[in-house]
Amino acid sequence: MVMAKAEKKSVSHHRYPQVIKQTPRGTAIANIALFRFLNRDLFGNLDNLYRTVIQTSGPLVLHFHVLHSYWLNLADIVTFCEKVKAQKPDVTLVWTLHDHWSVTGRCAFTDGCEGWKSGCQKCPTLSNYPPVRVDRAHQLIDGKRQRFRDMLRLGCQFISPSQHVAEAFNSVYGAGRCQIINNGIDLATEAILAQLSPVPLNPGKPRIAIVAHDLRYDGKTDQRLVHDMMALGEKIELHTFGKFSPFTGQNVVNHGFETDKRKLMSALNEMDALVFSSRVDNYPLILCEALSIGVPVIATHSEAAQEVLAKSGGQTFAATDVLRLAQRRKPEIAQAVFGTTLDAFRMRSRVAYSGQQMLEEYVSFYQNL
């Protein structure tokens, strides 16, 4: 399994010997500096894995995940795969698409832009991730898409956790080219969640959670919506989880970025709801996790939120309705979002986002390769 985002060692590098730090820090820094002008990653390859791959006896699956945005050069990835397939034909290539990068000229998240459907003629924003100073997406999109067609020619099978990403990919590269396997909570997290018991109903003001890696980024956290919730004053208690919170007030509790999953889930378990306002996610795992422990999610309209919530019978809302719902108690929120009781919602969600279900789907996928 190959994920390129590894400029520094993560916890996985220490726990699992099979997890390899692929892109050197210097390479990532060079790509970050040049990307703003070139709109592509100039450096980074998988050549150091070539000998290991071809010397592995028997059939082998190379499963790619997120390789873009400062980590690996796309053309070099394709060249590597061509060399591997020529030397070891029993290698199977699989690529899970976690965003729209495969169909755009540059962006990983479209943020509502549909310019990729007409060749990314003029980017409406240079700040959309990954940000640039010069827009060259329209010059790069045809060559980039050819690289993905090269991967398809090599027999690469594409998967996405989200239907809207798969549909976008299939609209460009052909019907049925990308299959869907929804995200689910991993088995380690599921073990943590299984130990969390429903807490007694909160007798005080509603506790509302906001979770994001970087709370300053408006694409992930609607800044205006959060300030509107803060303006509700004593009607709610707002809890943020993430780095660089710009939110301060008498009704705001900033917990910071919590790396301990058990502590984060325990804290969320105390909440009446999680408010989700991201425009740039595709199948957000935090929603699966919150819903799995019986915390209702009040989400603004987005394809990602609609797809995740629909799996447990939920719906999304306009920002004005989010403000209204955030002032309600947990059972009322569950009824409004999911059309059922809190207990029924809990049971439904535990099944809908099960990591075991995701694992079984992947096992079935691998068995049919």
Annotate the PLM regions:
Residues W116-F158:
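Membrane-proximal helix-turn-helix segments that form the acceptor-binding/catalytic region
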Residues H164, G184:
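Carbohydrate-associated surface elements
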Residues L196, L323, V337-N368:
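A charged, aromatic-enriched C-terminal amphipathic alpha-helix characteristic of glycosyltransferases
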Residues V199-K220, M230:
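Conserved donor-binding/catalytic core segment of Leloir-type glycosyltransferases
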Residues M265, L287-S292, E303-E307:
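Short alpha-helical segment that forms part of, or immediately flanks, the ligand-binding pocket
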Residues R279:
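Aromatic "clamp/platform" in nucleotide-sugar-dependent glycosyltransferases that forms part
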Residues P296-A299:
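Short hydrophobic beta-strand element within catalytic cores of glycosyltransferases
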Residues K311, Q315-V337:
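Conserved acidic donor-binding segment of nucleotide-sugar-dependent glycosyltransferases
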